[in-house]
Amino acid sequence: MTSTDTKTTEKHGFRFSDIRGMFGGGQSTLRQFGILGSLIAIILIFQIFSDGLTLSPGNVINVMQQYSYILILAIGMVMVIIMGHIDLSVGSVAAFVGIVVAKSMAEWNFPWWAAIILGIGLGALVGAWQGLWVAYVGVPAFIVTLAGMLFFRGANQWIGDSISVPVPKEFVTIGAGYLPEIAGIPIPYNVPTLILGVLAAAWLVFFEWRTRRQQKKMGSERAPLWVSVVKVVLLCAVILGAALLFGSGRPGTSFPVSGIILLALVILYSFVTNHTVFGRHIYAVGGNRQAAKLSGVKDRRVDFFVMMNMSVLAAVAGMIFVARSQASGPQDGNGWELDAIAAVFIGGAAVSGGIGTVIGSIIGGLVMAFLNNGMQLLSFGADTVQMVKGAVLLVAVGIDAYNKQQGRPSVLGFLTKRRNPPGEFAGIDTTPIGARAMEAPPAAPPAPGPRSSSSPTPPAADDSATKEPGSR
């Protein structure tokens, strides 16, 4: 594509696809931003009915700390579900690692940093054990992790004697600590939190600039400049607003350390799933295992490392929870696997595998977190909270199932089809797969017309094979 062509692609009129391009394009991306819109609506509704408590700095910080471990579990769970598996043991594994880490510091005199290394190593060992059964023995992940859920729950209660084990103050920092204050700066905000927000916004601007530059260099079609500007302005406003919100919290508090750990994991795993060979193999195996194997993907190895990674993240989540609670107890981790699975499905993952994103799972987890928090602020009972969470999960998965039924367009697809001008998807077959199979076969090509005098005459066929023996 020439530079003239590239400029032409940027100077067209308004199209509905420009809005889609603002968010990355594709039905899965639109679904994620639909969920993000639902999250914003939930927050605003509870903000109104709670008299402004939902978005108060103290409450937002509390939500980040209280649900960070569920969001960390959702990061690993989405990879497991993309592969077509399920992990029911994450809550028990988190509790098991938590009690071992607490005992190692309280009774075995481990320093806090050595206890963290022990916990991560123990999570990797548990994950390797379960991954071995799933990947190389062939036992379904549902059965393996169900057994793990029972085994490690019992191990937690056996090792801890069904009592709470406290942890030292240094360890508490990873679950209940905050970014430090900088003395001598006369502003009513936490400076490290503001710096973190500015750096995040600057990285977002740089990333968008680099993306457009690469598109221009490759000659691919770019969205209009106003699309990139609007997207960057909106996202930077959200980031800087969050930085101001966290930085103006209770005296002595700022952005929590558990939130820093969560953000680091989100960035890391978003990169792994989107920009590495291993991430592409996860989607390939989850989408079509046989085709991936024929393409040379070692599906068993992918199964093994995905299961091991899930247990490592469960160990991290368990240690953060123990640090925030300042002790490890026998009831830690109960129901965590259900919250993580619900977050992944609400975030747009497919039950059949092959579809899902880290960002979508985080958004789904935040939906669950603010639902819980908002109903608690409004003094709803635990029974009502559970019923609402179940209804939200059912609706989210039901919408996904409806969108995938052959011959039925999704709501987003219907709007896109109605609003795009003719030729918007020229050259792309949008017929559902099931409908294609029912279409009539293409008509036979027309018989050739009379041959012109200028057309070359084909060579005469050798009819020697048709002659009778002995004929000349």
Regions found by a protein language model. Name each.
Residues M1-L44, S164, A201-V232, G241, ...:
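Cytosolic-side transmembrane-helix boundaries in multi-pass membrane proteins
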Residues I40-F49, L53-W108, Q130-F142, T273, ...:
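Single transmembrane alpha-helix segments in multi-pass membrane proteins
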Residues D51-N62, Q157, L245-G259, S270-G279, ...:
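Inter-helical junctions in multi-pass inner-membrane proteins, predominant
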Residues Q66, A141, S164, P168-E170, ...:
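Loop-to-transmembrane alpha-helix initiation sites
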Residues H85, G127, M307-I320, R324-G390:
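Transmembrane alpha-helical segments in multi-pass inner-membrane proteins
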Residues N109-L150, I363-G364, M368:
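Alpha-helical transmembrane segments within multi-pass membrane transporters and channels
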Residues F152-T273, P330, P409-P422, I428, ...:
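Transmembrane helix-bundle core of multi-pass membrane transporters
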Residues F207-R222, L268-M307, E468-G470:
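Membrane-helix/interface signature in polytopic inner-membrane proteins
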